[in-house]
Amino acid sequence: MGTLSKGTGAVAGISQRQGRYKRSAPAFLIILAALVLLLGYSMILSVCTGIAGGSFKVFAETVMSPAKASGVGMIMLEMRMPRALAAGLTGMAFALSGAVMQGITRNPLSDAGLLGINAGAGFFVALSAILFPAAPDIVKTCAAFAGAALAVFMVYGFGAGKHRSESFRFILAGAAVSALLTALSQAVSLAFGIVKSLSFWSAGSLSGVTWQSLKMLSPVILSASALGLLLSSRLSALALGEDSAASLGVNVRTVRLFGMLVVLLLAGASVSLVGGIAFIGLIVPHISRLLVGGDYRRLVPVSALMGGVVLVLSDIAARMINAPFDTPVGALVSILGVPVFFALTFRKEGMVL
């Protein structure tokens, strides 16, 4: 990160040049605190909600004495708690990766899917189901992460150029790699008859989350989130334009490289844990801009917290819509996200970075 530290002092004047603060510092802190409380409350609500029942009293007793948990308490401990934590973490990761992706490409329609992460993960999950059909779910998780990494490396290899202006090349490379890996995934699934077994994962679901997979991937998500927060001031500089960012002492290519690393770690870990969940990384950053403006030092943390809230509440709804059966939360988020996306698109202000 030594290279990224260059120009930190110069970046301090970005807010005056952007003129995009929509809230004062106290208002921003209030919004941040409200989102933290809302995220905590929604996660507790998720643990206490289900067809087997539950209450805050049982939740508190289970947290205080997990060894004594039984009945509903055991369901909370072994099934609902890892699911709620995974929803919060992956929702934060999807939204934060979307904000970072929009920052490094300077494209308000970008999200992690632009790097082919979902397509790469899906292709490798299909391969793992064919090659290791009896393997535990952790193998599928590792395969998904490996596929996401391969997709990002392919996009970066095709999209990187000799000049600083690489955003358009990345977009084209991402679209091409996504189309290729999606086609390969569909061909393999049809050829080996595994379409049905992969459909629930590809639609996005938190039903298969375990403490084991959560413990393996949560350090990745938390570390990448911290790196994304460190990048936020450089993303604000990049939003002014590549030449302006360079004049402020920001190494554009290095910021873009670290930004892609953040997106890979966040979205790759999340997709491997809960499957492909679209629209959170695209829509949540736009909603966050309406609250705190376009400065990424405010946009990144607010997007992360709001993404966690959105996915936790969506998962609660997905569990209760057709109880006792699970509705894929990715499908529900997409259904709710489309009208929100159109509403944001046709705002008079437009979608500005």
What residues fall within each predicted segment?
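Alpha-helical transmembrane segments in inner-membrane proteins
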Residues: 2-353
